[in-house]
Amino acid sequence: MPHGLITIRRGRRTDLPALAPLLAFPPTHDTDKKHTQHWRRLVSDPAHDFYVAEQHGTLHGMVLVSYVRTLVHLGWLAILNIAVEPLAPGDISHRLIDFAKARARKRGCQRLVVYVSGSEPQMALTPLLEAGFLRMGEVLSCSLQGRP
Protein backbone atom coordinates (compact mmCIF):
# COMPACT_ATOMS: atom_id res chain seq x y z
CA MET A 1 0.00 0.00 0.00
CA PRO A 2 1.87 3.11 -1.16
CA HIS A 3 1.88 6.30 0.93
CA GLY A 4 3.81 8.97 -0.93
CA LEU A 5 7.43 7.97 -0.69
CA ILE A 6 6.69 5.35 1.97
CA THR A 7 5.42 1.91 0.98
CA ILE A 8 3.87 -0.55 3.40
CA ARG A 9 4.25 -4.04 2.04
CA ARG A 10 3.99 -7.61 3.27
CA GLY A 11 7.14 -8.70 5.05
CA ARG A 12 9.36 -11.35 3.50
CA ARG A 13 11.78 -13.87 4.92
CA THR A 14 14.61 -11.97 3.26
CA ASP A 15 13.82 -8.84 5.31
CA LEU A 16 15.35 -10.26 8.50
CA PRO A 17 18.90 -8.92 8.04
CA ALA A 18 17.63 -5.37 7.49
CA LEU A 19 15.20 -5.51 10.41
CA ALA A 20 17.37 -7.38 12.93
CA PRO A 21 18.87 -4.16 14.39
CA LEU A 22 15.34 -2.98 15.28
CA LEU A 23 14.76 -6.20 17.19
CA ALA A 24 18.09 -6.05 19.07
CA PHE A 25 19.09 -9.61 18.20
CA PRO A 26 22.28 -10.71 19.93
CA PRO A 27 24.94 -11.46 17.28
CA THR A 28 25.69 -15.10 18.12
CA HIS A 29 25.59 -17.90 15.55
CA ASP A 30 23.22 -20.12 17.57
CA THR A 31 20.69 -17.37 18.14
CA ASP A 32 20.95 -16.26 14.50
CA LYS A 33 19.77 -19.71 13.42
CA LYS A 34 16.95 -19.74 15.99
CA HIS A 35 15.86 -16.21 15.05
CA THR A 36 15.88 -17.12 11.37
CA GLN A 37 13.65 -20.16 12.02
CA HIS A 38 11.33 -18.10 14.23
CA TRP A 39 11.22 -15.33 11.61
CA ARG A 40 10.32 -17.75 8.81
CA ARG A 41 7.47 -19.15 10.88
CA LEU A 42 6.10 -15.68 11.64
CA VAL A 43 6.23 -14.54 8.04
CA SER A 44 4.45 -17.64 6.73
CA ASP A 45 1.86 -18.06 9.53
CA PRO A 46 -1.69 -17.12 8.42
CA ALA A 47 -2.55 -16.15 12.02
CA HIS A 48 -0.27 -13.11 11.64
CA ASP A 49 -0.15 -10.06 9.42
CA PHE A 50 3.46 -8.99 9.03
CA TYR A 51 4.21 -5.79 7.12
CA VAL A 52 7.19 -3.48 6.72
CA ALA A 53 7.53 0.23 5.97
CA GLU A 54 9.96 0.87 3.15
CA GLN A 55 11.23 4.13 1.73
CA HIS A 56 13.62 4.28 -1.23
CA GLY A 57 14.59 0.63 -0.67
CA THR A 58 15.35 1.08 3.04
CA LEU A 59 13.24 -0.63 5.70
CA HIS A 60 12.37 1.77 8.53
CA GLY A 61 9.86 -0.21 10.56
CA MET A 62 7.64 -3.24 10.88
CA VAL A 63 4.33 -4.25 12.32
CA LEU A 64 3.12 -7.70 13.31
CA VAL A 65 -0.54 -8.22 14.11
CA SER A 66 -1.43 -11.57 15.67
CA TYR A 67 -5.00 -12.80 15.91
CA VAL A 68 -6.31 -14.86 18.81
CA ARG A 69 -9.65 -15.89 20.22
CA THR A 70 -10.17 -15.13 23.89
CA LEU A 71 -12.71 -15.96 26.56
CA VAL A 72 -13.27 -12.31 27.44
CA HIS A 73 -13.75 -10.78 23.98
CA LEU A 74 -16.25 -12.18 21.51
CA GLY A 75 -14.69 -12.78 18.13
CA TRP A 76 -11.05 -12.08 17.52
CA LEU A 77 -8.57 -10.00 19.47
CA ALA A 78 -5.65 -8.43 17.61
CA ILE A 79 -2.27 -8.13 19.32
CA LEU A 80 0.11 -5.54 17.90
CA ASN A 81 3.90 -5.61 17.84
CA ILE A 82 5.58 -2.62 16.25
CA ALA A 83 9.19 -1.58 15.82
CA VAL A 84 10.31 1.60 14.07
CA GLU A 85 13.80 2.90 13.50
CA PRO A 86 14.42 5.82 15.90
CA LEU A 87 15.52 8.13 13.06
CA ALA A 88 12.76 7.08 10.67
CA PRO A 89 10.56 9.75 9.11
CA GLY A 90 8.02 10.87 11.74
CA ASP A 91 4.86 9.55 10.15
CA ILE A 92 6.01 5.95 9.68
CA SER A 93 4.85 4.93 13.17
CA HIS A 94 1.43 6.48 12.59
CA ARG A 95 1.08 4.87 9.16
CA LEU A 96 2.00 1.44 10.49
CA ILE A 97 -0.47 1.80 13.38
CA ASP A 98 -3.26 2.94 11.04
CA PHE A 99 -2.43 0.07 8.70
CA ALA A 100 -2.54 -2.44 11.58
CA LYS A 101 -5.92 -1.09 12.69
CA ALA A 102 -7.31 -1.48 9.17
CA ARG A 103 -6.01 -5.06 8.89
CA ALA A 104 -7.48 -5.98 12.29
CA ARG A 105 -10.86 -4.45 11.39
CA LYS A 106 -10.83 -6.40 8.13
CA ARG A 107 -10.41 -9.60 10.15
CA GLY A 108 -13.38 -8.66 12.35
CA CYS A 109 -11.47 -7.63 15.46
CA GLN A 110 -13.12 -5.22 17.87
CA ARG A 111 -9.98 -4.38 19.84
CA LEU A 112 -6.25 -4.00 19.22
CA VAL A 113 -3.85 -4.38 22.15
CA VAL A 114 -0.15 -3.83 22.71
CA TYR A 115 1.71 -5.39 25.62
CA VAL A 116 4.38 -3.14 27.13
CA SER A 117 7.08 -4.03 29.61
CA GLY A 118 7.52 -0.62 31.17
CA SER A 119 11.05 -0.32 29.83
CA GLU A 120 9.93 1.31 26.58
CA PRO A 121 10.92 4.94 26.25
CA GLN A 122 7.98 7.34 26.31
CA MET A 123 8.71 8.40 22.73
CA ALA A 124 8.03 4.81 21.61
CA LEU A 125 4.58 4.91 23.25
CA THR A 126 3.63 8.41 22.06
CA PRO A 127 2.41 7.36 18.57
CA LEU A 128 0.22 4.66 20.16
CA LEU A 129 -1.30 7.10 22.64
CA GLU A 130 -1.87 9.62 19.85
CA ALA A 131 -3.62 6.87 17.84
CA GLY A 132 -6.21 6.36 20.58
CA PHE A 133 -4.64 3.61 22.67
CA LEU A 134 -5.38 3.78 26.39
CA ARG A 135 -2.99 2.41 28.99
CA MET A 136 -4.24 -0.19 31.46
CA GLY A 137 -1.22 -1.43 33.40
CA GLU A 138 1.05 -3.33 31.03
CA VAL A 139 -1.46 -3.17 28.17
CA LEU A 140 -2.29 -0.42 25.72
CA SER A 141 -5.73 -1.01 24.21
CA CYS A 142 -7.64 0.59 21.35
CA SER A 143 -11.23 0.00 20.28
CA LEU A 144 -11.66 -0.75 16.58
CA GLN A 145 -15.38 -0.04 16.60
CA GLY A 146 -16.69 3.19 15.20
CA ARG A 147 -14.73 5.31 12.79
CA PRO A 148 -11.67 3.83 11.02
Where are the predicted features?
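Active-site rim helix/loop that mediates acceptor-substrate recognition in acyltransferases
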Residues: T31-F50
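A short beta-loop-alpha structural element at the N-terminal edge
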Residues: I6-L19
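A short, internal acetyl-CoA/4′-phosphopantetheine-binding micro-motif in the GNAT/acyltransferase core
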Residues: I79-D91
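Conserved beta-strand in the GNAT
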Residues: V52, T58-Y67
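Conserved catalytic-core motifs of GNAT/GCN5-like acyltransferases
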Residues: Y115-S117, L129, L134-R147
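Conserved acyl-CoA
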Residues: R95-R111
